From Swiss-Prot:
The gene is EPM2AIP1. It is found in: Endoplasmic reticulum. The modification Phosphoserine is found at S146. This is EPM2A-interacting protein 1. It comes from Homo sapiens (Human). GO terms for molecular function: identical protein binding. Pfam families: zf-C2H2_12. One of its GO terms (cellular component) is nucleus. Expressed in heart, brain, placenta, liver, pancreas, kidney and skeletal muscle. GO terms for biological process: glycogen biosynthetic process; positive regulation of glycogen biosynthetic process; response to insulin. Interacts with EPM2A. Keywords: Endoplasmic reticulum, Phosphoprotein.
Amino acid sequence: MWMTPKRSKMEVDEALVFRPEWTQRYLVVEPPEGDGALCLVCRRLIVATRERDVRRHYEAEHEYYERYVADGERAALVERLRQGDLPVASFTPEERAARAGLGLCRLLALKGRGWGEGDFVYQCMEVLLREVLPEHVSVLQGVDLSPDITRQRILSIDRNLRNQLFNRARDFKAYSLALDDQAFVAYENYLLVFIRGVGPELEVQEDLLTIINLTHHFSVGALMSAILESLQTAGLSLQRMVGLTTTHTLRMIGENSGLVSYMREKAVSPNCWNVIHYSGFLHLELLSSYDVDVNQIINTISEWIVLIKTRGVRRPEFQTLLTESESEHGERVNGRCLNNWLRRGKTLKLIFSLRKEMEAFLVSVGATTVHFSDKQWLCDFGFLVDIMEHLRELSEELRVSKVFAAAAFDHICTFEVKLNLFQRHIEEKNLTDFPALREVVDELKQQNKEDEKIFDPDRYQMVICRLQKEFERHFKDLRFIKKDLELFSNPFNFKPEYAPISVRVELTKLQANTNLWNEYRIKDLGQFYAGLSAESYPIIKGVACKVASLFDSNQICEKAFSYLTRNQHTLSQPLTDEHLQALFRVATTEMEPGWDDLVRERNESNP
């Protein structure tokens, strides 16, 4: 959870190296080709080879094999599995049918399918088996995918995942929250609350904590109470909270009435850090677009896209655009979802490349084309495309998880340096960093011939200045702890005299330890701090946990946002808050449901 310093031997993927001892412990081997770990039991490839990922797969899928505990038994088991002699878990036909039904319900939830589509899946499987394996058609008799059963099973999976999260949360040394009130593109009445916690061995867990209905919790006090209730249920107190990541809406960051100020006030304690808040990670492109769209460009383009979807759908020149649109949110889309899709750098760049075709299309359907003769509007369009492309690149960098908060903050600082450079270049009319604007300016020069002012540099300097101020405001707290982030990202090169007084003795001792220096060189930072003795370095270890708990990416929020935009019509159907939370937990979690526990729970409820 720190910036990755320059090291002589370290590579980014060192944390993903297969360890031989995992074979007996978790029944996995290194695959013959590629990265990851190959499970000897189910032959599934576990792509992310971190020990916690391998362990979670084993605990969720193959708990049965824990009965082979002695070293000799374990070694014999591995050898049998290598030869394909699989000791089969003693599941009854009913239990196998229940596992299959649960797995299918989870898949339906992941794909955002409606409750009633389980019956269709059942019919498809029945037709397939009758034609291919007629002797096995009877196995479907125990698989129930009716709407009511599908709902119940999704809720059961949600409870199982939530219990796993709560069991881990009780051991969190520190945690942070991400509060997202902008994910719902169909209606703004839910707050998604995500948690990122760090366990005793610096194992990081990111998951959905709860969904809060803003219709029922309209006031900040009511929101605060709902969040506190969820934290209490998870066995967490505010004294362990280190950071808050939010959108920059007034509901979140209002100076006197925002939820952030309210939570920071409640979290004040002699034994905890001041809560670190930053509000620029979530929906960076979407929310920043409102600051840089100086001429309501996106609203105009939105009208064009609606026309294309209704009257130009068969035109070959627009097929790439329509395919891109449908891959994001399906064939049917509401106005707000379309508007949000247009506020992405990738989308605007594609539309800019089709502007000539769009002008011809608008002429053919009798729509106005006045914007294409408006010099100012065209320049604003080109500038918007370029600045949103730069924001897209930053957003992509912030979408990479497990890079640590300090590394993410490095990306922010680098972007701010770029903004300063953009300011100077615009002032000098140097459009090297603005290829779309340069293209528009060149076209206008060819059309006008005379030497006249094509674009106003001051206009775009003001936009860049506004963006700079917003970034400064959003990441103010990270600047406040920048020295701390640098210290724990590179402890062996940080001068002790610049460190806080409380940590100088430990830091000096750490830097003098040759063994620790060697470990630091060959391990990634997470592994290094996980192995650091809490008895010898209690302050460094404690702060390492806190730094590791800060959200380092917007990945989990983007995953939720993407899930909603792809399945907006399914999720717009009448759903209880409980069902909505279950769907989003299944869609965003990296945990595997405990299938054995779910089957056992089903048997106990249906003796």
